[in-house]
């Protein structure tokens, strides 16, 4: 890699952070490399190997003697210790070392937890002091009364695990010196607005300014109260100042991988950081990043949020598909994590695959609406049948998309050469990148565009609460500066995870609209989504342990 010693900040023997400012200052006059996003069709609950495909593509491009870097999200401890496991890839296409990658890395998520929870500490402490002191006593401490409404608190506590018992809690049940007695909650750390800010900030100054705008509550006159009002924004930034530098790891074949930020895509922005992409585009000829879940969720946010915030324009988008997922969308039984795969998936069924390709075609068309060249990667499994693969290739090519079969899980970079060649060719073609909406488009119209053009809905409905917030936001002069970050299930194009393929004749229900002014977007919430996932009955932590002779962790996957 083209890095100087001063730009590398070692963390042990296998991981480092990169001083993004020194790199970007030194490389300011260089042209950017090719920018590639890896997305997917609507996944099964098992996932379709998108992270594995990112690693495989990076390795394949390396085998073609291309200067390449990967840029992926840091995994949350919640899924790692739950059913899903880590997100390092698999087989011969992984980000290594796995244990460091999966168990905290350099502490970025911990820094975000401390910063976020410090905001809650400041809020609840202020509420206690305002309850116990007169205005004159507050003034003696250089404080003014914020008059926080106890039922209009926007912030929660966060923890990096899936802990359903913490979704609804009561705090402050002691005496008057034990804080206010209020209903509160915990969310998973990667859903924090601070994680979104880390993902989209262009530099430290941008991150500092965004943290100051985070709304933590409203007062009794319904005016927003920010971290700056609590005078905690500087300290929150201090907790995150090291986290702003991307983490450097590698594939199994030695290509560099930048790991930075980790917001989920169904409940947050679902992207690795803008800063990691800026660094990758300057130090390599190809920067391969990943957006969470399917193109309806992760790619849509990459397209209309991340690229808008960063100013970067992609050259190509990869859509990862598996025969397994196509069969699921075509009528096969839905696989359940932790249970044996239904036997139907091991048998040839071209009809199911062809029917499932309707979902794939929908995502191809979504990528085309962004003006980007699509490449379909068939992430090959040993149960795939030649006739099933032929059907997918025929349908994709007829739709005008490049398609490549990749066996990177089994063969590493050597199995991804066809995949890499397709991406190289796509990057050489001109594209006409354009956003789905401009920021001066009214929020209601934006939601309608996303629902109809990306999800395939007939229209949008609103609960009375959501309609009230929509009306209020229409009058907010800052609305024109905010993007739109939709929240919905990742298991269907619709809001209903049971509806597979390309659902028809449905309306997208918006039950609430949240505002994240620090991150710079509003969040329309479709369907029932929790910011705190639950831990299942057979979690991964049951199989994680430590070798007492070597001290090495075992059982992480």
Swiss-Prot record:
Lineage, highest ranks first: Bacteria, Pseudomonadati, Thermodesulfobacteriota, Desulfobulbia, Desulfobulbales
Molecular function GO terms recorded: ATP binding; formate-tetrahydrofolate ligase activity
Assigned protein family: Belongs to the formate--tetrahydrofolate ligase family.
Protein name stated in the entry: Formate--tetrahydrofolate ligase
Pathway involvement of the protein, from the record: One-carbon metabolism; tetrahydrofolate interconversion
Single biological process term from Gene Ontology: tetrahydrofolate interconversion
Disulphide bonds in the chain: none
Taxonomic superkingdom: Bacteria
């Amino acid at each position: 890699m083209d890095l100087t010693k001063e730009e590398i900040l070692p963390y042990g023997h296998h991981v480092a952070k990169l001083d993004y400012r020194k790199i970007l200052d030194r490389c300011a006059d260089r042209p950017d490399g090719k920018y590639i996003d890896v997305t997917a069709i609507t996944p099964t609950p098992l996932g379709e190997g998108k992270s594995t495909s990112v690693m495989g593509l990076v390795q394949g491009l390396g085998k073609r003697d291309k200067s390449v870097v990967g840029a992926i999200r840091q995994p949350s401890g919640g899924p790692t210790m739950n059913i899903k496991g880590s997100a390092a890839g698999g087989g011969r296409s992984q980000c290594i070392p796995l244990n460091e990658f999966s168990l905290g890395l350099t502490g970025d998520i911990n820094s975000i937890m401390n910063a976020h929870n410090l905001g809650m500490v400041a809020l609840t402490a202020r509420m206690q002091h305002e309850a116990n002191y007169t205005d004159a006593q507050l003034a003696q401490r250089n404080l003014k009364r914020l008059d926080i409404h106890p039922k209009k608190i926007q912030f929660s506590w966060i923890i990096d695990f899936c802990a359903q018992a913490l979704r609804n809690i009561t705090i402050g049940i002691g005496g008057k010196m034990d804080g206010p007695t209020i209903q509160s909650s915990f969310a998973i750390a990667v859903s924090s607005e601070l994680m979104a800010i880390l993902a989209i900030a262009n530099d430290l100054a941008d991150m500092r300014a965004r943290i100051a705008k985070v709304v933590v509550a409203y007062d009794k006159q319904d005016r927003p109260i920010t971290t700056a009002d609590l005078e905690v924004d500087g300290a929150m930034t201090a907790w995150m100042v090291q986290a702003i530098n991307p983490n450097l790891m590698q594939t199994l074949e030695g290509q560099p991988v930048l790991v930075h930020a980790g917001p989920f895509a169904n409940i947050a922005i679902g992207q690795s950081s803008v800063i990691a992409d800026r660094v990758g585009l300057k130090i390599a000829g190809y920067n391969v990043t990943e957006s969470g879940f399917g193109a309806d969720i992760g790619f849509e946010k990459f397209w209309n949020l991340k690229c808008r915030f960063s100013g970067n324009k992609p050259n190509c988008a990869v859509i990862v598909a598996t025969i397994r997922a196509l069969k699921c969308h075509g009528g096969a039984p839905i696989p359940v994590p932790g249970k044996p795969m239904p036997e139907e998936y091991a048998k040839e069924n071209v009809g199911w695959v062809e029917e499932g390709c309707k979902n794939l075609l929908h995502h191809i068309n979504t990528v085309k609406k962004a003006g980007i060249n699509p490449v379909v990667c068939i992430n090959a499994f040993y149960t795939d049948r030649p006739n099933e693969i032929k059907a997918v290739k025929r349908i994709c090519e007829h739709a005008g998309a490049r398609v490549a079969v990749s066996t990177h899980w089994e063969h590493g970079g050597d199995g991804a050469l066809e995949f890499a060649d397709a991406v190289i060719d796509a990057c050489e073609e001109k594209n006409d990148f354009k956003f789905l909406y401009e920021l001066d488009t009214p929020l209601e119209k934006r939601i309608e565009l996303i629902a109809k053009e990306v999800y395939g809905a007939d229209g949008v409905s609103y609960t009375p609460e959501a309609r009230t917030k929509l009306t209020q936001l229409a009058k907010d002069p800052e609305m024109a500066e905010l993007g739109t970050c939709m929240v919905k299930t990742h298991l269907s194009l619709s809001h209903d995870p049971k509806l597979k393929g390309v659902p028809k004749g449905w309306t997208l229900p918006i039950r609430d609209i949240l505002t994240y002014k620090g991150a710079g977007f509003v969040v329309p919430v479709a369907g029932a989504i929790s910011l705190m996932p639950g831990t299942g009955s057979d979690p991964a932590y049951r199989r994680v342990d430590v070798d007492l002779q070597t001290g090495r962790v075992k059982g992480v996957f």
